[in-house]
Design a protein with these regions (language model features):
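Glycine-rich loop(s) and the adjacent beta-strand/alpha-helix scaffold that form part
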Residues: 1-41, 45
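A conserved active-site cap/scaffold subdomain adjacent to cofactor or substrate pockets
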Residues: 31, 62, 68, 76, ...
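Acidic/polar loop patches that form or flank catalytic/metal-binding clefts of enzymes
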Residues: 31-40, 65-67, 126-129
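Short coil/turn connectors at secondary-structure junctions
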Residues: 33, 53-54, 85-87
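Phosphate/diphosphate-binding loops
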Residues: 39-40, 47, 51-73
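N-terminal leader/propeptide and maturation segments of large enzyme subunits in energy/redox metabolism
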Residues: 91, 99-141
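A glycine-rich dinucleotide-binding beta-alpha-beta segment and adjacent secondary-structure elements
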Residues: 127-179
Length: 179
């Protein structure tokens, strides 16, 4: 995994047998087989249930949304693993967060405003606030022009405490396996 699929190797929960060291692959290569597309795999980011967290927003290290939060777990996992350098956070307000601290999604920042948690996470100055402002402006009108989140989960983020939940592949519950 480390050799052929290093991005999946970074995921916190590789699926498979710990004694599986690729012996079958190595035997095939030894007799002349070609090892093609060995980097392919499946990373899973199971952020729901509970469904109320889908009213939050998922952002990257720049404090920007990059996907609809209601995306299938595998689509979200793929986007974080392969397109966001393995880093993402779920931003929630008083109504959209988890009701308890789950081992797989630990809150890594909490505050009375979006700017407070953005500073705790080291996001570029004003970036997360701008993302939330844009999202809220459209959510109030029942629209998500960027990612078309369904109206079921679309509502403005408003009301402290605001929290950021860690979705980074190395730290969150992030199962992964190769094909």
């Amino acid at each position: 995994l480390k050799l052929y699929a290093p991005k999946l190797y970074e995921c916190s929960v590789p699926c498979g047998n710990v004694d599986d060291q690729g012996d079958g692959i190595n035997m095939g290569i030894a007799v002349g087989a070609a090892a093609l597309r060995m980097h392919e795999g499946f990373a899973i980011a199971p952020i729901y249930p509970p469904e109320n967290v889908l009213s939050g927003i998922v952002v990257n290290a720049s404090g920007q949304r990059f996907i609809s939060e209601e995306s299938y777990h595998g689509v979200l996992g793929d986007a974080i693993t392969y397109h966001q350098k393995g880093q993402a956070w779920l931003i929630t307000d008083q109504r959209s967060g988890y009701n308890f601290h789950q081992d797989n999604f630990l809150p890594v920042a909490e505050g009375s405003s979006i700017d407070v948690i953005a500073a705790q996470l080291g996001f570029p100055l004003g970036a997360l606030q701008q993302t939330v402002n844009y999202y809220n402006q459209h959510a109030i009108n029942g629209d998500d022009p960027m990612f078309r989140k369904s109206k079921t989960y679309l509502r403005p983020l408003q009301g402290a405490p605001y929290k950021a939940w860690d979705l980074t592949v190395a730290d969150a519950f992030f199962p992964a396996h190769t094909f």
